């Protein structure tokens, strides 16, 4: 199996605090991996290390068999697209189409080829009809889909989304996650997705969930395998996905008759 990302014996410290020590992680090409953990667990730092925005003290990072070094960092980055948390910080163009074109201009795509590439990328994420709109007129979810289109136009092998839905309302969050599912289905093994999140419901959509805390890999497996470890998740500051947490508490329902009012009162305690 081809490895999209391979991390061996990674060590990284910040302000004399060790964030990663002998950290190892392999991600197969075409896999959707959710990196989850509470704020400060190290997951966003890991993304910056993979992109070469931070430099590890020791260890190796390979992206599709290319070792990340000072000499190769720009070529490695060309294989990776990144979508960040705040959609407003990612727009540089006057219109949606201009924004998608910006990345293409940076890699010196011929101007005659740009319109087709822009239309293709916007169509994939369902934003083609908005291509002449000004970014400030879009919703948060629409802005993040445009950010995805800007990345897709560059044809990366890997897309990393760093808390890309954290600032969105439920509708915006849902549209972005639906778009990711569509990308997974459309591109298959040709596209590797890495979603960094603390939202467990989002993580259930991935092929694989990796739980990180204090720079250590705590759990690693399918969503079913990871979310069966309720105690370990709670010990690391995480909750189960809502449906799983509800199912757990329903199993603890008092074994006695309750009328409708009592049942409602008991259910209301589950949200505290």
Swiss-Prot record:
Any GO molecular function: ATP binding
Active site residues per record: 163 (proton acceptor)
Entry keyword S-adenosyl-L-methionine: no
Locations listed in the record: Cell membrane
Record keyword ATP-binding present: yes
Function: ATP-binding (A) component of a common energy-coupling factor (ECF) ABC-transporter complex. Unlike classic ABC transporters this ECF transporter provides the energy necessary to transport a number of different substrates including 5-formyltetrahydrofolate, pantothenate and riboflavin. Expression of the complex plus FolT in E.coli allows 5-formyltetrahydrofolate uptake; 5-formyltetrahydrofolate is not taken up in the absence of FolT or the EcfA1A2T complex.
Family the entry assigns: Belongs to the ABC transporter superfamily. Energy-coupling factor EcfA family.
Protein name: Energy-coupling factor transporter ATP-binding protein EcfA1
Organism this protein belongs to: Leuconostoc mesenteroides subsp. mesenteroides (strain ATCC 8293 / DSM 20343 / BCRC 11652 / CCM 1803 / JCM 6124 / NCDO 523 / NBRC 100496 / NCIMB 8023 / NCTC 12954 / NRRL B-1118 / 37Y)
Gene name for this UniProt entry: ecfA1
């Amino acid at each position: 199996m081809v490895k999209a990302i391979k991390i061996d014996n990674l060590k990284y410290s910040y302000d004399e605090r060790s964030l990663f020590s002998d950290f190892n992680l392999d991600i197969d090409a075409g896999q959707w991996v959710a990196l989850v953990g509470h704020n400060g667990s190290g997951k966003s730092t890991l993304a910056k290390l993979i992109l070469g925005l931070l430099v590890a003290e020791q260890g190796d990072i390979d992206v599709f068999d290319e070792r990340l070094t000072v000499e190769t960092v720009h070529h490695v980055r060309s294989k990776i697209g990144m979508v960040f948390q705040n959609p407003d910080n990612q727009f540089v163009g006057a219109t949606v189409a201009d924004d998608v074109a910006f990345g293409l201009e940076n890699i010196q795509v011929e101007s005659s080829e740009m319109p087709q590439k822009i239309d293709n990328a916007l169509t994939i994420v369902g934003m083609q009809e908005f291509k002449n709109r000004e970014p400030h007129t879009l919703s948060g979810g629409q802005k993040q889909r445009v950010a995805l289109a800007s990345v897709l136009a560059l044809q990366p092998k890997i897309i990393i989304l760093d808390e890309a839905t954290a600032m969105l309302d439920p509708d915006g969050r849902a549209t972005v996650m639906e778009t990711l599912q569509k990308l997974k289905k459309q591109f298959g093994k040709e596209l590797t997705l890495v979603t960094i999140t603390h939202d467990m419901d989002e993580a259930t959509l991935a092929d694989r969930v990796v739980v990180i805390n204090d720079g250590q890999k705590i759990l690693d497996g399918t969503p079913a395998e990871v979310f069966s470890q309720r105690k370990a998740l709670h010990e690391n500051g995480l909750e189960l996905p809502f449906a799983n947490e509800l199912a757990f508490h329903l199993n603890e329902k008092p074994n006695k008759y309750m009328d409708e009012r009592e049942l409602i009162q008991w259910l209301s305690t589950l949200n505290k």
